[in-house]
From Swiss-Prot:
InterPro entries: Alkaline_phosphatase_core_sf (IPR017850), GAG-degrading_sulfatase (IPR051849), SGSH_C (IPR032506). This is Uncharacterized protein HI_1316. Pfam families: SGSH_C (PF16347).
Length: 194
C-alpha cells in the first residue's frame, strides 16, 4: 500500500472486539482446525492491529442496512447498462439502494459453505436482528446481533429463543428452496427436530 495511505491510520487507535480475545468459545470445533491451518493465532495482537490499520482505507464508512447478495452485482451491471435484467437472474439491482437510498425489503440473506476445508455443510440465515448458523454435523448458532454484535453468546439451545429459532429456520429453508439449494430437502426433514 503506497504512502500517504500506509501511514494514514495508527495501530494504537485500533480497539479490538471482545470476540478477538475469546474467538472460539461456543463455536463449532472446526473453527479451531481452520485457525490452526491458517495460523490465525500465531500472530500477535500488535500484528493484527497493524493489519487492520493498513486495510482501514478500504472501508468507506457509508452505512446502509439493506441486505444484499453477491449475485445482486450481475443484475446491477445490467441495470447500469440500461439493459433489462433477465428473469432468470436471482439477484436484484442495488442501484435503487445506492442512488435513491431505497429499502430493498429483504428480510434476510442466505450464506453457504459447502464443505471447503471443513467436514460438514454450513448455512447461515442473516436478518437485521438475528443471525442463525446451521452446521450440519456440529453445534448450530443463533445470535442477537443487535444486542450481541460480536456474537459472543450462542442462543441456539436456549429455550427462550425457540420461537425465533424456528422462525429463522423456516425462513432459511424457504430461501434455500428458492435458490435450489440441495441441502434444503435435508433441512426440511429435520427442521422440527433441532
Amino acid at each position: 500500500m503506497p504512502e500517504p495511505y500506509y501511514s494514514m491510520y495508527r495501530k494504537e487507535d485500533v480497539v479490538l472486539d471482545k470476540s478477538f480475545f475469546t474467538p472460539l468459545e461456543g463455536k463449532p470445533d472446526h473453527f479451531r482446525t481452520i485457525s490452526k491451518m491458517w495460523g490465525m493465532w500465531e500472530a500477535s495482537e500488535d500484528h493484527w492491529k497493524e493489519v487492520i490499520t493498513k486495510f482501514w482505507g478500504y472501508i468507506t464508512l457509508i452505512e446502509d442496512d439493506n441486505l444484499v447478495y453477491l449475485h445482486d452485482l450481475t443484475s446491477t451491471v445490467f441495470d447500469l447498462a440500461n439493459q433489462k435484467v433477465p428473469e432468470s437472474f436471482e439477484g436484484q439491482s442495488v442501484l435503487p439502494i445506492m442512488r435513491q437510498h431505497q429499502d430493498n425489503q429483504r428480510k434476510g440473506v442466505l450464506g453457504q459453505l459447502a464443505g471447503h476445508f471443513v467436514y460438514f455443510e454450513q448455512r447461515m440465515w442473516r436478518r437485521k436482528d438475528y443471525k442463525l448458523v446451521f452446521n450440519a454435523t456440529d453445534v448450530c448458532e443463533l445470535y442477537n446481533i443487535r444486542n450481541d454484535p460480536e456474537e459472543m453468546h450462542n442462543l441456539f439451545y436456549d429455550p427462550q429463543y425457540n420461537r425465533i429459532k424456528k422462525e429463522m429456520l423456516e425462513e432459511m429453508r424457504a430461501e434455500m428452496k428458492r435458490l435450489n439449494d440441495p441441502l434444503e430437502n435435508w433441512v426440511y426433514r429435520i427442521i422440527d427436530e433441532i
